[in-house]
Amino acid sequence: MTMFMPTPSQFDPDERGHFGKFGGRFVPETLMPALLELESAYNELRFDREFWSEVDYYLKEYVGRPSPLYYAERLSDELGAKIYLKREDLNHTGAHKINNTVIQGLLAKRLGKKKIIAETGAGQHGVATATIAALLGLECEVFMGSKDTARQELNVFRMKLLSSKVQSVESGSKTLKDAMNEAIRHWVTHARDTFYIIGTVAGPHPYPMMVRDFQSVISFEAKKQILEKEERLPDYVIACIGGGSNAAGMFARFLDEESVRCIGIEAGGLGIESHHHGASLAKGSPGILHGQMSYLLQDSEGQIEEAYSISAGLDYPGIGPEHAYLFESGAAEYDHVTDAEALEAFVWLSQKEGIIPAFESAHAIAYLKKARERFKDKVVIVSLSGRGDKDMIQAKNLLNFH
């Protein structure tokens, strides 16, 4: 397989970091120098073959890429479709998150930073960041809402084992949004020696573009793999969506293809009329959060509302600005599935294919059932963004197996 590198796209933001009206850089003055330094460094390296050959080495030898595109035969038989799973769950650390952290870690080293910080929800991005810090010999601190540290205690232990410090955040809803607030607050006062590794396609420019570029390795591989297997492009590409990085990576190389429909699946929680969900596009409105303009869950006064999902990685009350743009322009489509549907799909995939997905990925799998009629006789790729190890304790408490 030829070496992965980002390619310019019609969906790139403008020079001020806007995807249409979304995105931008709404941050305190004190952060502008760090963001401008990062933007300038990334612009230099974005198409630099030497940098990407170093990245290529780590993606292959350390992360274990390319990840397989697996034909799910028993799912396909049941649905009357050809279902392929892009196996991001097989990456080192068990999810797509490491694609991004390994490249941001190499960028931090290039900039001479000694310390990296990150926010995390489900803990997967925190573990991936702590992993890269250990690999590259960097100091690491991870911010995590106290609600998430309680439901993801194994990932908290993993981060500590990897010699990272974990800051439990007690403010606000004590989840991902608040962890991100604290990480940004910390960065404001430590920007000189600290690199902030954002885990999703959100935040101020250049992060949404950078993280999308780094995760686009998913569709770079999947496109080649499906052409080898089917000698044609898929009809549909599906990915779950919280902040939206695995979906952005899965969509990136397919968005330019007229024949391919990209579908992002939000967290429907207890139902999108219930106020207990994470469906920012279905139920949100444009506003500003974490340095960007995008769709947010907010009340009539513009106060951010708490997002909810069975999955700690999907309960973010906003969405990456590129997704907001793709949603409004119709270049991609978005739907949602409930906790109950995701849990059913979690069991379904486990028992049909012997693959236990993360709760996040189970949302994308659930959509195959929810919209099964539209997939009949079609070729479909689903991003299996992570494995279910981290969700075992929660699943055991929710499912009654005798």
From Swiss-Prot:
Pathway: Amino-acid biosynthesis; L-tryptophan biosynthesis; L-tryptophan from chorismate: step 5/5
Reaction(s) the record says it catalyses: (1S,2R)-1-C-(indol-3-yl)glycerol 3-phosphate + L-serine = D-glyceraldehyde 3-phosphate + L-tryptophan + H2O
Matching Pfam families: PALP
GO MF entries: tryptophan synthase activity
UniProt xrefs under CDD domains: Trp-synth_B
Function: The beta subunit is responsible for the synthesis of L-tryptophan from indole and L-serine.
Protein's recorded name: Tryptophan synthase beta chain 2
Organism field: Wolinella succinogenes (strain ATCC 29543 / DSM 1740 / CCUG 13145 / JCM 31913 / LMG 7466 / NCTC 11488 / FDC 602W) (Vibrio succinogenes)
Species classification: Bacteria, Pseudomonadati, Campylobacterota, Epsilonproteobacteria, Campylobacterales
